[in-house]
Amino acid sequence: SIMKMDGSQQEENLDVISTGSLGVDLALGVGGLPRGRVVEIFGPESSGKTTLCLEAIAQCQKTGGICAFIDAEHAFDPVYARKLGVKVEELYLSQPDTGEQALEICDTLVRSGGVDMVVVDSVAALVPKAEIEGEMGDSHVGLQARLMSQALRKLTGHIKRTNTLVVFINQIRMKIGVMFGSPETTTGGNALKFYASVRLDIRRTGQIKKGDDVIGNETKVKVIKNKVAPPFRQAEFDILYGEGVSWEGELIDLGVKYDIVEKSGAWYSYNGSK
């Protein structure tokens, strides 16, 4: 079909789903992750990728949204998810055997129009059927990249039409022999880089200690690509073990940044009260 934008279709504000982090929502420029789009969240191990996605699922469920989690890594922890505010009993969970099965389930969920958010954890774990059925040591060059490219070609139209948010979690690999620039790359070929409207790079920058015990991570998120707002903004926040994003700490940090809260030494004051 072809249509003319003659004013009959009013430009509406973009539908978004909050990430559960005020700083990341601000860095995204639209107040959250855009619906009807593909989002990629990548970073090193234990940097908070799955935590950020579970926080977003919890926020989506709070507004009455229906969410699905495709656990290709077979590492979903319902106890931890519940601690982050996820209503596990209302979450659709799939643990597929192959990459083809995972992406077929994702496509079916999106086409149904009955799901608001789908998370795929992770692209690196989407193993092609041929690789699973083959022998250890067999070479399967480019199979995963081809699988992702084909799946995204099919998915994007359905995602836009049903206004579903699809988040792909991805891992980092090192390119061999890179002399200049970053040797880091994400798995699954280049297709996801092109199809994603938002790409978030999440990193652990330090530890949070209480005495000698480490109780959390200092985390930095960089918006590497953004088709819905200006890119390259950053957000810093704390992830506390067993609790998720430290909302209170983030509120104070943003208060200081925007001169709402005054900081002098180790003291914070708001309207004169410390």
Swiss-Prot record:
Highest taxon listed in the record's lineage: Bacteria
Single GO BP term: DNA repair
Positions with a binding annotation for ATP: G43, P44, E45, S46, S47, G48, K49, T50
Keywords carried by this UniProt record: ATP-binding, Cytoplasm, DNA damage, DNA recombination, DNA repair, DNA-binding, Nucleotide-binding, SOS response
Disulfide bonds: none
SMART domains: AAA
Signal sequence interval, chain numbering: none
Pfam families: RecA, RecA_C
Gene Ontology molecular function, alphabetical: ATP binding; ATP hydrolysis activity; ATP-dependent DNA damage sensor activity; single-stranded DNA binding
Localization per Swiss-Prot or TrEMBL: Cytoplasm
PROSITE patterns per UniProt: RECA_1, RECA_2, RECA_3
InterPro entries for this protein: AAA+_ATPase, DNA_recomb/repair_RecA, DNA_recomb/repair_RecA_CS, P-loop_NTPase, RecA-like_C, RecA-like_N, RecA_ATP-bd, RecA_C_sf
GO cellular component: cytosol
Family in the record: Belongs to the RecA family.
PANTHER family given in the database record: MITOCHONDRIAL DNA REPAIR PROTEIN RECA HOMOLOG-RELATED, RECA
Main function: Can catalyze the hydrolysis of ATP in the presence of single-stranded DNA, the ATP-dependent uptake of single-stranded DNA by duplex DNA, and the ATP-dependent hybridization of homologous single-stranded DNAs. It interacts with LexA causing its activation and leading to its autocatalytic cleavage.
Designated name of the protein: Protein RecA
Source organism (scientific name): Neisseria pharyngis
Lineage, opening ranks: Bacteria, Pseudomonadati, Pseudomonadota, Betaproteobacteria, Neisseriales
